[in-house]
């Protein structure tokens, strides 16, 4: 404050008046009055500035640095893990074995005798052959005789063609008569007759007998 007072004394009256005007003080009076006014003004403001510095110092001491809060990222719910075992599809495998073959295998497994019809059906199904039912067929069915072939063979060996054709006609008539009257010959008898006729035919061809 002594230095400020010395400086004020060094100032001229005009300069003192300007200082008073700048601070809003009265400019009337002698030089000493102006110096006193300026000193009183400076002392007051010096105390105010000191008080302000003390207050500001206390506030700065009280204010502690706040910790910086980082934004917390929300945890996302875990994705659902697909249970692969539960999604496995059960595929039913159907067997491509025919019914007849399965019946045959089942019979073999349990030692059950298999009928002849089921065996034939299984064999036909295995090889892709359409099985023809044997029931309902008469046992006296004979293979059809080709008359043209018989005639050619008879002419080749010099046999009488008329006798062969007549014999075949007689056989046909006999067969029709049996069918008309419901006469059914056994398969054994049919086989014997066919063998006898074949032997006779071969013998006639060998010796050239008409």
Curated annotation (Swiss-Prot):
N-acetylalanine carried by residues: 2
PTM sites of type N6-acetyllysine: 10, 142
Sites of Phosphoserine modification: 163
Keywords: Acetylation, DNA-binding, mRNA transport, Nucleus, Phosphoprotein, RNA-binding, Transcription, Transcription regulation, Translation regulation, Transport
GO biological process, one term: poly(A)+ mRNA export from nucleus
GO molecular function, one term: DNA binding
Biased composition (Basic and acidic residues): 65-87
Protein name listed in UniProt: SAP domain-containing ribonucleoprotein
GN (gene name): Sarnp
